[in-house]
Structure formats: structure tokens, C-alpha cells
Amino acid sequence: MKTTKVAKKEEVTRDWYLVDADNKVLGRMATEIANILRGKKKPIYTPSVDTGDFVVVVNAAKLQLTGNKLADKMYYHHTGFPGGIKSITAGKLIEKKPEDLIRKAVKGMLPKNKLARHMLKKLKVYAGPEHPHEAQQPKTLDI
């Protein structure tokens, strides 16, 4: 009888990947990033263990959205006070905080459980081309 080997947290080796978001479509890029954060392309992938790698995204301010999503797509949050629902379009969010647009897209593609918070901590997003993770020697990932 064959048994399935379950990955343990201590056995996982984590790599660093660098993604350039310049002229990339948000959704297509976010799905690839979510798969890397989960570790789905590794042979030791286990759904109940965080086997994913670190991802550094640069040039978040230069990403693309298809169609009229810059003007039509709305992002909502609530302040907690009565009548405190706030909304912002995707175009204004790119101007104000381009990192949040990628982070929200990837967060929606991760599992809705406790592991998602640990996976999201491995995502580092920067609006410009510079990042402070050169010491980790990230591999360039072409998406």
C-alpha cells in the first residue's frame, strides 16, 4: 500500500521570486502570484501546510486593467461607524496606493482560512522599481 507524504513546516525550503508588474494585467498576474504563495507548483504541496515561496512585486503603479475597470471597478470598506461605507475606484486606488490593488487581488485568490494570513505576509509589493530584498537574491519570474 502506498502512502502519501505530508509536508511539514520545517521541511519546506522557501525561494524568493521577483515579478515586474509593468504593463501586466492585474488578474492574470495575481493568479500566478497566488499559486506561488500557496506552493501549488511544488511537488511537496499540501493544502493544510504553507509550502509557498516569497514574492516581491515591483512597479505596481504601472500595472494594467482591461476594459473600463479603471473607472468602473469599485473597492469598498467600512469604517465601523453607522453610514461609514467608503468606496474608491480602481483608477484612484492606483494613484493613491498601487500596492493595495495587487494585495487585494491576491488575497481574494488565496484560501479563506488561517493559512491565508501567513501566505499574504510572504507577498512584498512596491510601487516603484526599487525594493529592499536584494540580499535574498530573488529569481526573476516572467509572467
UniProtKB/Swiss-Prot annotation:
Question: What NCBIfam families does this protein map onto?
Answer: rplM_bact (TIGR01066)
Q: What is this protein called?
A: Large ribosomal subunit protein uL13
The residues the entry assigns to the signal sequence are none
Similarity remark: Belongs to the universal ribosomal protein uL13 family.
- GO biological process per UniProt: negative regulation of translation; translation
Could you tell me the keywords of this UniProt record?
A: Ribonucleoprotein, Ribosomal protein
What is the documented function of this protein?
Answer: This protein is one of the early assembly proteins of the 50S ribosomal subunit, although it is not seen to bind rRNA by itself. It is important during the early stages of 50S assembly.
Q: What's a Pfam family this protein contains? A: Ribosomal_L13
Under the heading InterPro entries, the entry gives: Ribosomal_uL13, Ribosomal_uL13_bac-type, Ribosomal_uL13_sf
The terms under GO molecular function for this entry are: mRNA binding; structural constituent of ribosome
Recorded GO CC terms = cytosolic large ribosomal subunit; ribosome
